[in-house]
Amino acid sequence: MHKKTASTICAVVLCSAIAWMSVEIHGQGTPDFSGVYYPAPQGGARGGAAPAGGQRAATTAPPPPTRSAPTGDLSNGRQPTAPLLTPEYMAKWEVIRKSRMSGSYEYDPIANCLPPGMPHMMSMAYGMEILQTKDRITFFSEWQDALRRVYLDGRKPTQKILNDPTYAGYSTGHWEGDTLVVDTVALHPDSFIDSSSPHSEEMTVKERIRFISPGVLEDRITVTDPKALTKPWETVHTYRKAAPPNDELREFACAEGLRGSPR
């Protein structure tokens, strides 16, 4: 390789690194997560392409679960397994499983166009846009335009908020170096932890969100629920930042999938 060519390549790499740093660093040395992301599949991150099937495929109800029961915790690197449920909530899960196996989705909030809830929202196979300002970070999910806000200004949930749980819950966060630490409470008990595991009104979610490489975001999630779980459940999700023209989320009209097209 010619010295001139090698120097040019090094300059390009260095400029790219500097450009990435200037984009990712926000405010007082904290990363800027702003952008549109898609889930990075196991073994690598998707290169910014929109999910196959798009909006119409997303209105199809998920297949019935085939596992015999929810078991295990984070035991194989980034491959999460299902939460360990207490006997009371294992019985609830059995009702959900039997309902799905019979072709009914009565107990499935997503199949009924309700929000996915937390932490399930962070594991959906759809795009997600993050908008970051000094005092808050807002997550917009492509699934049914669901959103959640993480407040960074030091506020705490009031008793009124705790008494009125929502699907996204109430999230507050702070920075520990380059990692955003988020605590979420006041979560609606009709949502699921994952795709089918129920939880109680006492569930809380802690996240540690950070860049693990340029444009690749990692969310390490710990779920605690003394009534529904025999021990805290951990899972990890990664997301790849999209580049134009794939950095635009599509409108998601979930109800159209339920009633059919008017035409």
Task: For each feature predicted by the language model, list its residue ranges.
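PEST-like low-complexity, intrinsically disordered acidic/proline/serine-rich tracts
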Residues: 2, 20-263
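N-terminal secretory signal peptides that target proteins for export/translocation
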Residues: 1-7
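Bacterial N-terminal signal peptides
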Residues: 9-20, 24
